[in-house]
């Protein structure tokens, strides 16, 4: 049976996102290597600190930049202000990166919006996320936008409650097993998992076998099952 409501993830589901963070990561490692520091160590330290810092710094470009500054201070306990400014600039560039829609999204969303009530559901820094949403050409197709610090079963349940959406009448669509699919499953909501090659490592998780999870290889294929 088809649902009435669609809750749709934004980053790496509607538009490219993680590649900007990956590019910034590489720029930081090169910056450290250029100062004579070990490239592999800069790379692994940044990965580790980014994961460890999520509870303190949250998600997003400036959180990544703060982790870069932390790594830099491990290499140079007396930091150079110009290097710190350079790291800040890397973060700002990611913060306001251009929004490139993923293939099929702009063609499919208008069709879905004629039939479903749709919610954009995203996590991270509200200013950063809302900036991308404003820049995107698809905001008009959504009835609601919700940005939370973390996507988990509890925040997912609250979104259902806030918008008065019954679990059995709602589907979740996203690229992240951990942040999109598992929270939906925990709330009895069917989901469509659309894997993306550049999804952040921290978002990966083994998915259980479930009749509540449909996997598609491209966004436009939603029209095959929802229209
Ligand atoms: Mg995503």
Residue ranges and their predicted role:
Residues 1-45:
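Active-site neighborhood of HAD-like aspartate-dependent phosphohydrolases
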Residues 49-93:
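A metal-dependent, Asp-based hydrolase signature
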Residues 34-38, 76-79, 137-140, 164:
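Short helix-capping segments at alpha-helix termini
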Residues 1-4, 106, 110, 126-227:
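Asp-based, Mg2+/Mn2+-dependent phosphohydrolase catalytic module
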Residues 82-100, 105-136, 145-148:
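Substrate-recognition element of Asp-dependent hydrolases with the DxDx(T/V) motif
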Residues 21-29, 65, 69, 126:
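An amphipathic alpha-helix signature
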């Amino acid at each position: 049976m088809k649902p009435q409501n669609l809750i749709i993830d934004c980053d790496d589901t509607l538009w490219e996102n993680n590649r900007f963070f990956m590019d910034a990561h590489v720029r930081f490692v090169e910056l450290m290597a250029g100062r004579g520091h070990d490239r592999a160590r800069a790379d692994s330290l940044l990965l580790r600190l980014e994961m460890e810092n999520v509870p303190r710094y949250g998600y997003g470009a400036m959180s990544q930049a703060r982790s870069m500054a932390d790594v830099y201070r491990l290499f140079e306990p007396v930091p150079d202000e110009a290097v710190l400014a350079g790291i800040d600039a890397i973060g700002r560039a990611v913060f306001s990166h251009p929004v490139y829609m993923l293939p099929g999204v702009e063609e499919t969303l208008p069709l879905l919006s004629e039939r479903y009530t749709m919610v954009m559901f995203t996590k991270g820094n509200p200013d950063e996320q809302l900036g991308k949403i404003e820049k995107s050409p698809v905001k008009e197709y959504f009835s609601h936008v919700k940005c939370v610090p973390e996507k988990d079963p509890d925040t997912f349940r609250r979104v259902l409650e806030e918008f008065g959406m019954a679990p059995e009448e709602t589907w979740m669509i996203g690229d992240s097993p951990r942040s999109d699919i598992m929270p939906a499953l925990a709330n009895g909501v069917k989901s469509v998992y659309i894997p993306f090659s550049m999804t952040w490592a921290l978002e990966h998780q083994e998915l259980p076998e479930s009749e509540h999870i449909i996997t598609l290889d491209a966004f436009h294929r939603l029209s095959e099952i929802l229209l």
